[in-house]
């Protein structure tokens, strides 16, 4: 995960294969039609190849998306924040698809999964006689897939700070910068370390017999400290020697262990990828603007550049609401008023 650190250099190397993603960019755009149909585009800027078939959105040509790939650096250095990393993002993958409704989109992009990015869309159209209002939202589901709750490591003040973070790239005060550094330290040096350990520990518990389970639980805290102490002499893959030293004969080369480990690693790799991303989200919704929570607006295009922290531990919703006049209703109302006025005038003349 981003800035992932552990006390033991050896254990860090062991984790590196799981938490080894590099910075990348994700741009998502939705054009909303009056009938609720959607045109969605998801663009990935990355150093990695083969993302057209293997990506954390689970989308591709097989799922009916129109896919285009550009491996030139110029494509990856489009209008974005000026940074050194722009020249390193060599691949651009663009995925486009039209959906009849938000529900159809959700069937594909919001399916529950521990190893995929989940995006839920919502569209509401309400008739108000003189106006019709249009509400649209996209929700990024929390990227934290650890079973360990973060509430024991983060306070309400921390979550309020995250909620108030400005768009990515916007300046923050020195005090806020110091607070953010400390927050990241608690997230990655404390919460992520413990959560990562608990996932593997529970994996071993699931494979242990009664006697082995008792030993594991008895030595749980000492195992944790040993894994993260600075001068640990463990191998890069510490579990075999650790279990052997405790006399716990769990076979970590078994097919069942490898299967469970692969499942866990797919979840960890997703979290690592998601936390390293730079995000830009766009909603296009015609009409007179009523309300929104966008970072910026140009015409009827609403833009967000959220920090990954916005949706690290809880869902984050981007929304916009507009309205359009109902011409027929206005004309009908005017005709009714004219008819009433004409009737009153005739009565007065009588």
Model-identified regions with their sequence ranges:
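Start-of-domain marker
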Residues: 23-85
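Short, charged juxtamembrane terminal tails flanking transmembrane helices
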Residues: 346-350
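Residues in flexible loops and secondary-structure boundaries
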Residues: 9, 38-40, 291, 312
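Mature, soluble, non-transmembrane domains
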Residues: 72-337, 341-344
């Amino acid at each position: 995960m981003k800035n992932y650190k552990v006390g033991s250099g050896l254990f860090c190397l062991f984790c590196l294969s799981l938490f080894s993603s590099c910075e990348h960019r994700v741009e998502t755009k939705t054009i909303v039609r009056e009938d609720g149909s959607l045109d969605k585009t998801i663009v990935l800027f990355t150093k990695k190849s083969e993302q057209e078939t293997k990506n954390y959105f689970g989308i591709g040509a097989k799922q009916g998306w129109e896919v285009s790939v550009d491996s030139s650096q110029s494509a990856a250095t489009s209008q974005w924040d000026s940074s050194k990393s722009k020249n390193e993002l060599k691949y651009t993958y663009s995925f486009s698809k039209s959906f009849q409704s938000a529900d159809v989109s959700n069937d594909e992009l919001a399916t529950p999964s521990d190893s995929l990015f989940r995006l839920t869309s919502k569209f509401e159209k309400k008739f108000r006689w003189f106006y019709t209002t249009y509400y649209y939202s996209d929700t990024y589901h929390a990227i934290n897939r650890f079973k360990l709750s973060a509430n024991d490591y983060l306070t309400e003040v921390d979550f309020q700070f995250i909620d108030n973070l400005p768009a990515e790239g916007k300046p923050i005060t020195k005090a806020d910068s110091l607070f953010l550094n400390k927050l990241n330290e608690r997230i990655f040096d404390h919460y992520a370390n413990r959560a990562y350990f608990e996932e593997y520990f529970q994996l071993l518990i699931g494979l242990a017999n009664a006697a082995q389970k008792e030993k594991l639980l008895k030595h749980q805290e000492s195992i944790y400290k040993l894994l993260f102490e600075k001068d640990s002499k463990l191998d890069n893959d510490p579990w075999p020697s650790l279990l052997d030293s405790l006399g716990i004969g769990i076979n970590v080369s078994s097919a069942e262990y490898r299967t469970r480990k692969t499942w866990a690693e797919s979840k960890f790799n997703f979290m690592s990828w998601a936390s390293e991303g730079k995000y830009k989200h766009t909603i296009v919704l015609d009409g007179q603007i009523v309300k929104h929570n966008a970072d910026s607006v140009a015409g009827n295009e609403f833009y967000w550049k959220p920090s990954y922290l916005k949706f690290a531990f809880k869902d984050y919703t981007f929304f916009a609401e507009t309205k359009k006049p109902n011409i027929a209703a206005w004309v009908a109302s005017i005709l009714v008023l004219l008819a009433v006025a004409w009737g009153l005038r005739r009565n007065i003349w009588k």
